[in-house]
Regions:
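Short amphipathic alpha-helices within nucleic acid-binding modules
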Residues: 19, 79-84
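Core segments of cupin and vicinal oxygen chelate
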Residues: 2, 7-49
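N-terminal beta-strand motif that seeds the catalytic metal site of vicinal oxygen chelate
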Residues: 1-17, 68-71, 123-131
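Short hydrophobic/aromatic beta-strand element in the GNAT-like acyltransferase core
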Residues: 39, 72, 106-107
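Helix N-cap motif at beta-to-alpha junctions
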Residues: 12-13, 75-79
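Vicinal oxygen chelate
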Residues: 30, 82-131
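Exposed loop/turn and edge beta-strand positions of beta-sandwich/beta-sheet ligand-binding modules
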Residues: 36-38, 67, 103
């Protein structure tokens, strides 16, 4: 068993697709429905299948992030990722060292609906493993 994808409800599909494309996601499939709703499947380069679904349901009213805390994207170089996102017009936060100097480097960026995305560069020792 494994996680297939997670879905985010978005208020403006065009704006959200532009944001996630700037982050690095690639659109795989778009499914429009007669009621004006749409689903869009995305993945990051290097992923073998869909990892993110954007759900646009205009009839459901305003989008609220609610109890959603964040999701994380592993990056090879946090500095290069921050530079690329900034050049694309996004506003990633300053690098942080939440685990101290030997831990991961992180930064945060927020999507148009307020969903927080953590960008993580693991130290040379790698990501933590759990048995």
């Amino acid at each position: 068993m494994r996680t297939f994808l997670f879905a985010l409800r978005v208020s403006d599909l065009v704006r959200s697709l532009a944001f996630y494309t700037k982050v690095g996601y690639v659109e795989l499939s778009k499914i429009p429905f007669e009621d004006g709703s749409s689903l869009v499947w995305l993945r990051l380069p290097g992923e073998s299948s869909v990892s993110l679904e954007l759900v646009h349901r205009p009839a459901d009213g305003p989008v609220e992030a609610g109890g959603f805390a964040h999701f994380a994207i592993e990056v090879e170089s946090l500095a290069e990722t921050i530079d690329r996102l900034t050049a694309a017009g996004l506003d990633p936060g300053e690098p942080e060292l939440p685990g101290g100097p030997d831990g991961p480097k992180t930064s945060w960026v927020v999507d148009p609906d307020g969903y927080r995305i953590e960008l993580v560069e693991w130290p040379p020792s790698g990501a933590p493993t759990f048995d």
